[in-house]
Amino acid sequence: MEGDLAYIGAGLAGMGTGIAALGVGNVAANFLAGALRNPSAAASQTATLFIGIAFAEALGIFSFLVALLLMFAV
Amino acid sequence: MGKLVFYVALALVVVSGVLFAPEHAGLAIHPMDQFTVEALFGGAHVAWYTPTNVTLWMFLAIGAIFVLLVLGSANRGIVPSRAQSVAELAYGFIYKMVEDVAGKDAVKFFPYIMTLFMFIVTANFLGLIPMSFTTTSHFAVTGVLAVIVFVAITVTGFVLHGAKFLGLFWVSSAPLALRPVLALIEVISYFVRPVSLCIRLAGNIMAGHAVLKVFAGFAGALGFASFLPIFAISAFYALEVLVAFIQAYVFTILTCVYLKDALHPSH
């Protein structure tokens, strides 16, 4: 029974990766919107873009890790 | 000519998929098996000094970097050879990143950041070779890299600024009542940095490789249509090449951001 609950928890944690995808998409979409308005400033901001994506993505990876732990370690 | 080769390869894939379809359908491989650490020269016990496949692929990564950077630029041609121009591109790319993100006075840390980037990107790319082992997919490997970054940057901050480095946690632009709360949050976020550096890299690489192996495992379940997953695998492989580079880039650029905090801690 406990193992089954762990699988349910892993599935719930898997939702977190999808929600992090929303965040990454949000960062990229806003970057593109800004870049199209002022294309000359876009190239200097790609580093910021990647940092933003990395921070948004990290939390999704955390929930992926929780899912993995529930699947294989609990 | 190229088209012909492509069609012949495609036909070979389809025919071999039909010919060698397994008798009983089922997932042929477990997606996590590829990450098993094994002793190179036999023996089940793995101690901290045992040469394992991790050791082997790390040394291969170092060898590849040596060939690219040292041997590639040994001729120092005015007109660079292909290896030399790749080496110069990598050097210039990282140098510019350190200068832009961490500032001009961070350039003395450039050798360390260059080493970090080259090791991670080479280990990621070597891991994409079929049947190879991805060292950066292990939390132990990326954890050591992240902890070294964390310790080095904290020590740098304290050596350069002494107790003033703690001003990083004391947000002086915020209202006085909020500052203790913000300080707590800043301290937590400071100590989560190595964790997130470590988990971001290893998690991304491990997830990507596990996805590739999940699709490879479908081949066993599809019977004579077992050639189908190769299309998905090719698409994901291209994505993984991109991810391998971007994650190495993100690791180093975050190191530069943290380095900037250590060099200029004023909030």
Swiss-Prot record, chain A:
It comes from the Bacteria. It is found in: Cell inner membrane. The record marks E57 as: Reversibly protonated during proton transport. Disulfide bonds: none annotated. It is a multi-pass membrane protein. GO terms for molecular function: lipid binding; proton-transporting ATP synthase activity, rotational mechanism. The keyword Cell membrane applies. GO terms for cellular component: plasma membrane; proton-transporting ATP synthase complex; proton-transporting two-sector ATPase complex, proton-transporting domain. Keywords: ATP synthesis, Cell inner membrane, Cell membrane, CF(0), Hydrogen ion transport, Ion transport, Lipid-binding, Membrane, Transmembrane, Transmembrane helix, Transport. Its main location: membrane. InterPro entries: ATP_synth_F0_csu, ATP_synth_F0_csu_sf, ATPase_proteolipid_c-like_dom, F/V-ATP_Csub_sf. The chain crosses the membrane at residues 5-25, 49-69. F-type ATPases have 2 components, F(1) - the catalytic core - and F(0) - the membrane proton channel. F(1) has five subunits: alpha(3), beta(3), gamma(1), delta(1), epsilon(1). F(0) has three main subunits: a(1), b(2) and c(10-14). The alpha and beta chains form an alternating ring which encloses part of the gamma chain. F(1) is attached to F(0) by a central stalk formed by the gamma and epsilon chains, while a peripheral stalk is formed by the delta and b chains. F(1)F(0) ATP synthase produces ATP from ADP in the presence of a proton or sodium gradient. F-type ATPases consist of two structural domains, F(1) containing the extramembraneous catalytic core and F(0) containing the membrane proton channel, linked together by a central stalk and a peripheral stalk. During catalysis, ATP synthesis in the catalytic domain of F(1) is coupled via a rotary mechanism of the central stalk subunits to proton translocation. Belongs to the ATPase C chain family. This is ATP synthase subunit c.
